């Protein structure tokens, strides 16, 4: 029988927590404290439901805590008008103890694209920090208000087109705002991002990347040193694209570099971003690059290459092909032309392509078949599951999802996670079988 073991080191004492692979539930049940709902200025009532989550060891005890985002029931996509309730963040220990609550306030709109939160130990003190974009009226985990508590920049359509934007780093243990600076990439002229109603300008991404090969950075993105860890914040991906890298030394956030597709020589990088990004050392120099959809930004904040294939909804970065050096990228495209592409992550060279006259909205990659070397890949219009040479190894697979992959059952193959269902590809029968359903 397989047995999974997690060990925490407290001082010089080693403690064990064991969950047998055949445990009756196969999961931990963590109670949550649901925020109270409210009413918008238009009279619409809203409630809260748990949304995205991340993990980090915020107290240094060797056990992860969960940072949970609560979204109101009236959260909106950027394309839609309407007021929303405030976004709320909680931190929980695995036993359900709530450590803090952060209320983002009325000047941060609720929706999938607005608030990207990074949880990581950025200064090497053994405890994770939390970094995200904030606004006037954000209340930290100690009850302190950031900026002007009375400011309200929402217009009659519930959109936020004016007002200051901030980047805040929070203490992961207490939720205290340790430093707040002006957010870069700034909003500026809305039309630079593609429209005047913040559908394009308020699409954000973020990641953690080892830009010097040793210490992580935070990178904040908009639009589709020293010995400390760094982060990158991004804005925009349909038109203008800006990425800003930051270092945190335990006292100060310092900007490392800014990449802007509006800068001379960078126009090929505009409009290439996805709704997601990937991080990895694609050129073998020991430092992380940022694969920003159909382009890649080098670790020094310069452009590495652009395929110019434009925005897409999904992609995967890994060492797909064991017979080929380096990393590769599997992508799908919206442009009703390029379909699905498999490319060299270092150069952008297209290794193989399945063209399509449709918007290919999802693609997936995972090692699900032991009969073929490397990682298998498929998309909504890939004509089946492909191996690393582009050959179809299964033309139709019933129940094959295009959402997420997990290691679930203890073998070396991946399982697939879609909503509350874990499924496993049966390569002998050519179908996916459910192995866990969470009610």
Predicted segments with their positions:
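Extracellular fibronectin type III
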Residues: 9-26
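Hydrophobic beta-strand segments that make up the repeating blades of beta-propeller
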Residues: 66-70, 130-134, 218-220, 231-235, ...
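Beta-strand-rich modules
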Residues: 1-11
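Short, small-residue-biased leader/transition segments that mark boundaries at the very start
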Residues: 223-228
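Short, conserved, GDST-rich strand-edge loop motifs in beta-rich repeat architectures
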Residues: 69-85, 132-162, 229-237
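Acidic carboxylate motifs that coordinate Ca2+ or other divalent cations, activating on Asp/Glu
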Residues: 61, 65, 125, 285
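Surface-exposed loop and turn segments in beta-propeller and other repeat-based domains
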Residues: 31-43, 103-109, 177-199, 258-270
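Beta-propeller blade termini
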Residues: 51-58, 115-123, 127, 205-217, ...
């Amino acid at each position: 029988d397989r047995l999974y073991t997690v060990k925490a080191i407290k001082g010089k004492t080693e403690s064990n927590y064991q969950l047998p692979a055949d445990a009756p539930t196969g999961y931990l049940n963590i109670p949550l404290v649901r925020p109270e709902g409210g009413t918008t200025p238009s009279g619409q009532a809203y409630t809260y439901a748990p949304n995205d989550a991340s993990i980090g060891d915020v107290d240094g005890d060797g056990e992860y805590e969960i940072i949970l985002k609560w979204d109101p029931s009236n959260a909106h996509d950027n394309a839609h008008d309407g007021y929303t309730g405030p976004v709320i963040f909680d931190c929980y220990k695995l036993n359900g103890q709530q450590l803090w609550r952060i209320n983002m306030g009325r000047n941060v709109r609720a929706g999938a694209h607005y608030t990207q939160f990074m949880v990581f130990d950025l200064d090497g003190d053994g405890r994770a920090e939390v970094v995200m974009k904030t606004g006037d009226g954000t209340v930290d985990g100690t009850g302190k208000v950031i900026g002007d508590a009375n400011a309200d920049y929402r217009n009659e359509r519930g959109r936020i087109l004016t007002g200051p934007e901030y980047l805040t780093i929070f203490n992961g243990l207490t939720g205290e705002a340790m430093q707040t600076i002006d957010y870069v990439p700034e909003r500026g002229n809305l039309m630079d991002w593609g429209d005047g109603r913040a559908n394009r300008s308020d699409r954000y991404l973020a990641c953690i990347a080892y830009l010097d090969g040793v210490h992580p950075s935070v990178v904040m993105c908009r639009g589709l040193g020293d010995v400390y860890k760094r982060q990158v914040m991004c804005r925009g991906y349909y038109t203008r694209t800006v990425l800003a890298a930051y270092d945190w030394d335990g006292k100060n956030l310092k900007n490392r570099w800014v990449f802007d597709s509006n800068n001379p020589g960078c126009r090929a990088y505009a409009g290439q971003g996805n709704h997601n990004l990937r991080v990895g050392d694609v050129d073998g120099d020991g430092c992380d690059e940022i694969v920003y959809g159909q382009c890649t930004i080098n670790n020094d904040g310069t452009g590495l290459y652009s395929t110019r294939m434009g925005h897409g909804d999904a992609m995967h970065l890994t060492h797909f092909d064991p017979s080929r050096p380096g990393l590769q990228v599997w992508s799908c495209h919206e442009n009703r032309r390029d379909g699905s592409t498999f490319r060299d992550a270092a150069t952008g060279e297209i290794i193989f392509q399945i063209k399509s006259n449709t918007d290919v909205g999802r693609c997936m990659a995972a090692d699900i078949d032991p009969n073929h070397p490397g990682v298998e890949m498929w998309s909504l219009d890939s004509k089946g599951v492909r191996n690393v040479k582009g050959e179809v190894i299964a033309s139709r697979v019933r129940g094959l999802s295009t959402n997420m992959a997990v290691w679930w059952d203890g073998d070396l193959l991946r399982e697939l996670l879609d909503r509350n269902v874990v499924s496993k590809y049966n390569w002998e029968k050519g179908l996916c079988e459910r192995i866990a359903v969470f009610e």
